[in-house]
Amino acid sequence: MIFVIGLGNPGKEYQYTRHNIGFIVIEKIANQYNLSFSTKKKFNCEIVESSVEKQKLIFIKPTTYMNLSGKSVISVKTYYNICSEKIFVIHDDIDLETGRIKFKTGGGNGGHNGLKSIDRVIGNNYNRIRIGVGRPQNNQDVADYVLNNFPRSEYEIVIQSIDKITNNFDLILENKLEEFKNKIG
């Protein structure tokens, strides 16, 4: 079983913000497999459950807002008895330049409130797909920065990153994590 969490905030006003890149990517991956999300209130998320290439697959988008993402993650993890090594969190990262992608297992949260919330309930030994959104300029507040939409000048770079993850997602299903890391990095 593979459990993939796209981090973001619910609501149209956040749909295309830097902080919602996790939602954007997970939706694109789900579309690739012709899968649709449905709301599960007991898990505080939108969820997709399916089998792809003989692999049970669960995608979620927490509906709790970023700072409480762990609430959804622990609910689904517990219900399906998923081990942390099979969890993949897709999220924005201000410490990476816009469009840069990094894959890692375990580690710190880099000040990311969604990851902090997840770490509190399941620890930090899970996989992360980090997507760079760049750092704010001119002393702009980080929270304001990540809650802004990507500027048009960054669209092409962001789309290429989303496509790179989506086009190589099958490698995760095949448990070829090192190859996935090399292809997206």
Swiss-Prot record:
Cited CDD domains: PTH
Recorded family membership: Belongs to the PTH family.
Organism lineage: Bacteria, Pseudomonadati, Pseudomonadota, Alphaproteobacteria, Rickettsiales
Protein name listed in UniProt: Peptidyl-tRNA hydrolase
One GO CC term, this protein: cytoplasm
InterPro entries: Pept_tRNA_hydro (IPR001328), Pept_tRNA_hydro_CS (IPR018171), Pept_tRNA_hydro_sf (IPR036416)
Pfam family, one: Pept_tRNA_hydro
Source organism of the structure: Rickettsia canadensis (strain McKiel)
Compartment(s) of residence: Cytoplasm
Tree of life domain: Bacteria
The EC number(s) this enzyme carries: 3.1.1.29
GO molecular function: peptidyl-tRNA hydrolase activity; tRNA binding
Site entry: Stabilizes the basic form of H active site to accept a proton: D92
Active-site residues, Swiss-Prot/TrEMBL: H19
Biological role stated in the UniProt entry: Hydrolyzes ribosome-free peptidyl-tRNAs (with 1 or more amino acids incorporated), which drop off the ribosome during protein synthesis, or as a result of ribosome stalling.
UniProt keyword list: Cytoplasm, Hydrolase, RNA-binding, tRNA-binding
Gene this chain is encoded by: pth
